[in-house]
Amino acid sequence: MSHVLETDIAGRTLKVEYGKVGMLSNCAILVSYGDTVVLINANASKEPRDGIDFFPLSVEYEERLYSVGKIPGGFIKREGRPTENAILHARAIDRPLRPLFPKGYRNDVQIVCTVLSVESDNQPDILAMNGASLALCLSSIPFTTPVANVSVGLINGDFILNPTQSQREESILNLTVSATKERVMMIEAGAEEVDEDTMYNAIRFGFEQCQKIVEFQEEAMRRFGKEKVEPVLYLVDKDIEKEVREFAFPMVKEAMYISDKDLRNEKIDEVKEKVKEEFEEKYPENDSDISEALYKMQKEVVRNMILREKRRPDERAFDEIRKISCEVGLLPRTHGTGLFTRGLTQVMTAATIGPLADVQILDSIEDEEFKRYMHHYNFPSYSVGETRPLRGPGRREIGHGALAEKALEPLIPSEEDFPYTIRLVSEVLSSNGSTSQASVCGSTLALLDAGVPIKRPAAGIAMGLVTNDDLTEEKILTDIQGIEDFFGDMDFKVAGTEKGITALQVDTKISGLSDNCIKETLIKAKDARMYILGKIKECIPEHRAELSPYAPRVYTMTIAPEKIRDVIGAGGKTINKIIGETGVQIDIKEDGKIYVMSSDSVGANRALKMINDLTKDVEAGEIYLGKVTRTTNFGAFVEILPGKEGLVHISKLDFTRVNKVEDVVSVGDEILVKVTDIDDQGRINLSRRDAIKKEEDEKTKENNH
């Protein structure tokens, strides 16, 4: 039986259809918003997965190019691996849902969001986020807390709910808020230096707008939701936990109070070894119970240390930042490098400047088709002292790279001001928390070192939170390290400049964040950001005046659009000849703007002259140095500009009578000629005699002076 429910959100219809498709799925729904349609399927395994200590939730966001009327590019005309945007959307769906599943739930849960139709005004990712929550709520899977999601824009001081495409282009804020009825679950934002008060008010606006969607999901659950199954939860054997605690708690507490990370980890390893020796024979089948008991003790010690004793594991104050060092110009042949170190977290970023032809071409359902600025993030195993196979970037690396990219994107100069493609690569050399925000700082250093005229330096900081069980007590931590991230309740990343926020990403492990927590964290993050920006400016106050000697230079010129074909030539013959003779790269835009890129200024200037000659109009009265291309009995044809020939009549070759053209000029000779006129058919008439006379007259004038 099919069920339909509709509501109005921002003047557009949000609709869910249940029971129409996917009859064998636990829950399959079609959600639509305007003409954007996404199919959501939610399923779970019947039994918990054995031998794991985590909740195996997977979210897939499947883009179908038919949804926007496209055929995939390349030789294989079908969708392949998920695009980076699809991976980012899948992560955004996962993050607010994961904390709301029952603790100890170990069944495999998979959510598949397939984009079927896209109207550019209505974003499919926001619709998929709402649909994923709704599918879980309607299914028999033990998930009962609806999560609503909205997009917020900011135009001329007004907040816009779920902005259309034209509004998104005008907006200085792109904010996503995920919330339950009581609290904010997740925040993701890119902004053009928006101040903290405005950002907080935007989040509040988003939270309030989420409530109607929460009510919509609750109504759907009441009308046609399935009965929930009773979950089988993983629980530690209480007797084993009690024994392990009595044996190991004093040792765990002693170890967790060691401020040095390496020494603390060594001590914890010793404790684990002693626990293993003590209980291995007694409980040979209960390794997971013992490990979980040890984890709970470590977590308890760290959280009590912060909440009860008002101290941090490394003895810093709650608002204190770890020691920072900045360095630029590390690598001699790169175009720009920055090394940013904060405590035991260290990131090196390399900047590369390239021609506009190196832009990234995107084949996806998104509005954007080209990227001239990109940031990539690498997190190798050695950064945490571990070993594992080195493969391509995972979802986490893609997510961290995108966040750092978003933080700097509003600061990158326009194509008109800086006609280059820019690629940043952040290498995490050492990780002890907040590597994505260290990447923002390292990227700023690298851009300044490369001579890129960014608007202002940017910096990032990760804030944390520790709460008690009923969420009545909160301690906000500035610059969280690994242990505080691992055992804490929030990861609140803020990046921006001295003027405002450019990127924000907030995740939580609890059932949401209070208003006061969000507001206070934004204020504390600003103080930390200002401190870090001061350190960056001490290292390199502004961008270098010159690009690296190893970076290519771009030279620009503009021609009339109708002249573009003259530069390209038949089948690209002309432009390829210029490139071959000068060794440059040439990029021609539809509006007639031409970018010539080369590390050799001589070659670049030669190419510019060749293009100028190709596109320059012949003017009557001007004198040109031309080459004789052929002779006839009535005169000589002379090429005065590439592809432009004129005739010197035999009577105008010399001051005296000429009986034979070859007596004066031969094919291949370079001669001065004057354009006497251009007739209605575009034929150019030349005179060697007048050119010589004009040159002699000018010499006479100079001698008289």
UniProtKB/Swiss-Prot annotation:
Reactions this protein catalyses: RNA(n+1) + phosphate = RNA(n) + a ribonucleoside 5'-diphosphate
Origin: domain of life: Bacteria
Subcellular localization(s) per the UniProt record: Cytoplasm
Main localization category: cytoplasm
Domain S1 motif: 621-689
GO cellular component: cytosol
Needed co-factor(s): Mg(2+)
E.C. number(s) listed in UniProt: 2.7.7.8
GO molecular function terms attached to this record: 3'-5'-RNA exonuclease activity; magnesium ion binding; polyribonucleotide nucleotidyltransferase activity; RNA binding
Keyword Nucleotidyltransferase among UniProt keywords: yes
Entry annotated with the keyword Cytoplasm: yes
InterPro entries linked to this entry: ExoRNase_PH_dom1 (IPR001247), ExoRNase_PH_dom2 (IPR015847), ExoRNase_PH_dom2_sf (IPR036345), KH_dom (IPR004087), KH_dom_type_1 (IPR004088), KH_dom_type_1_sf (IPR036612), NA-bd_OB-fold (IPR012340), PNPase (IPR012162)
Keywords: Cytoplasm, Magnesium, Metal-binding, Nucleotidyltransferase, RNA-binding, Transferase
Domain KH: 552-611
GO biological process, one term: RNA processing
Positions of Mg(2+) binding: 485, 491
Function: Involved in mRNA degradation. Catalyzes the phosphorolysis of single-stranded polyribonucleotides processively in the 3'- to 5'-direction.
Similarity field: Belongs to the polyribonucleotide nucleotidyltransferase family.
The protein's name: Polyribonucleotide nucleotidyltransferase
